[in-house]
Amino acid sequence: MFKGFREEYVQVDKGKLFCRIGGEGTPLLLLHGYPQTHVMWYKTAPELAKNFTIIAADLRGYGSSMVLPSDPNHATYSKREMANDMIQLMNKLGYDKFFVAGHDRGGRVAHRLARDHRQRVIAMSVLDICPTLDMYEATDMEFARSYFHWYFLIQPKGLPEKMIESDPRAWVDSCLQKWSGGREFGPAEEAYLAAFSQPERIHASCEDYRAAAGIDLEHDRADRDQLLNIPIQILWGKHGVIGRKFSPIKVWQAYTTEKVSGCAMPTGHFIPEEDPKGVITKLNNFFLSTN
């Protein structure tokens, strides 16, 4: 995995972030989703590195990055704090302006990063998400059944943590299988499981979702009408919820003055691992056209 990439632990204000770096060209920050780590990009990063300097990072609380104590308001794991981490990471690495691509939770961090640090992001690609606020506001029985984990993981007093800790493999495997339509994830799944076998990281991931259901929505409502001015690409899984429940291009177009492009991919939720060649092509075409 990640042949030709170097590993780095980068010191930021509140701890260390883990990332892999490789390639050359305009920086492209890759952010992962749940229940994963930066490893989810292992099929795509080496090819993307032929055109870009790739920085594949673990979000705080995930993978090998820092775990921080939670707080009653869940602000520690807000997307604003996670986005600030990534800005500090890019500062330390010497990158001023950059592209960002985020899947799932990473897409939500990328969106907040682009909103809070408007002069830094050249263009953004988000994979299999619509904005958090839109998704919560559209919640109905169909959505709740498909995204049950959104409502399970936010439960208080450590209940979801205790249940996941009782059998981490069953939880990780069920997420990967259910959301991909039964695909095999090979050695990557072991990397995800290694992180999800640590109680403090299970708790951190729950805090990520608790923040999304609270303080993140406050932030999103506060600047909802402040449009971005960057191109956005949205890729969604043909067999997933996003395309069935939303009109992704239309939803994202309401967030930027620039063009939104994108399409459905022949996948479930885990697009970069289910269709790596397609993702490589789409990301290359999009970012190279805006460079």
Regions found by a protein language model. Give the residues of each.
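Flexible "cap/lid" subdomain of the alpha/beta-hydrolase fold that forms the substrate-access gate
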Residues: 1-8, 14-17, 27, 55, ...
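Surface-exposed alpha-helical interface segments used for non-catalytic interactions
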Residues: 39-42, 46, 84, 111, ...
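Conserved HGGG/HGGXW glycine-rich cap/lid loop of the alpha/beta-hydrolase fold
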Residues: 20-68
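Conserved donor-nucleotide binding/catalytic region of nucleotide-linked donor-dependent transferases
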Residues: 184-185, 289-291
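Catalytic histidine-centered segment of alpha/beta-hydrolase-like enzymes
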Residues: 268-276, 280
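Proline-centered flexible-loop/turn and helix-kink motifs
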Residues: 35, 50, 118-119, 257-258, ...
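C-terminal alpha-helix
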Residues: 282-290
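Alpha/beta-hydrolase-fold serine-hydrolase catalytic core, especially in secreted/extracellular enzymes
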Residues: 199-200, 276, 290-291
